[in-house]
């Protein structure tokens, strides 16, 4: 997943985005058309909830933030917080449960409606019904993205068109 996301260089072979070798692309421009969540990075940073979702992308309209919250079933829960999106995130886990953190990270990943989403085994900490809802939405043909799941979770199978097994 880290190689696919462009965070590590492959030891052999190439990673191509739309036919172009990833090594020849500017990582900032790649970040505009892909989103990812890796198991090793399942935490929020100190700042507001809004800052955690925007991740410095201040050009993204507020309406898109609201859309991402609705997509991840967080809108009502965030609105119920006394400070809403301005709620300050301190040490991860103090305010938000792991399932909330995962949905916040999914909201961050989908916020710019990227062409490619890469998820590394992230949805296992969610309540099964919520997980199914999020998976169904992520894998919907109506969305503008392709999704790659790097996982050994057999429950993903009904949601994907193609599976590649690596040994």
Map each language-model feature to its residues.
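Helix-to-loop junction immediately C-terminal to a conserved catalytic motif
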Residues: 5
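Conserved ABC transporter NBD signature motif
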Residues: 13-20, 30
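A short, proline-enriched helix->beta-strand linker immediately N-terminal to the Walker B motif
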Residues: 111-115
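Catalytic Walker B motif of ABC-type/P-loop ATPase nucleotide-binding domains
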Residues: 117-121
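ABC ATPase nucleotide-binding domain helical subdomain, centered on the C-loop/LSGGQ "ABC signature"
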Residues: 16, 50-91, 135-136
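ABC-fold ATPase nucleotide-binding domain signature/coupling loops
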Residues: 75-104, 108, 122, 167
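Conserved catalytic loops of ABC-family nucleotide-binding domains
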Residues: 129, 136-151, 157-158
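ABC ATPase nucleotide-binding domain signature
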Residues: 33-43, 47, 57, 92-93, ...
């Amino acid at each position: 997943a880290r190689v696919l996301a462009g965070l590590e260089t492959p030891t052999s072979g190439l990673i191509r985005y739309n036919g172009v070798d990833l090594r020849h692309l500017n990582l900032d421009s790649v970040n505009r058309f892909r989103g990812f969540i890796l198991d090793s990075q399942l935490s929020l940073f100190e700042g507001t909830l809004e800052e955690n979702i925007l991740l410095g992308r201040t050009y993204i309209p507020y309406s898109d933030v609201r859309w991402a919250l609705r997509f991840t079933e967080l809108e009502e829960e965030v609105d119920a917080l006394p400070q809403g999106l301005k709620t300050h995130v301190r040490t991860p886990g103090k305010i938000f449960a792991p399932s909330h953190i995962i949905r916040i990270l999914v909201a961050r990943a989908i916020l710019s409606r990227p062409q490619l989403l890469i998820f590394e085994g992230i949805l296992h900490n969610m309540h099964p019904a919520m997980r199914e809802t999020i998976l169904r939405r992520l894998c919907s043909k109506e969305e503008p993205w392709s999704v790659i799941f790097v996982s050994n979770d057999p429950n993903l199978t009904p949601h994907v068109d193609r599976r590649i097994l690596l040994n």
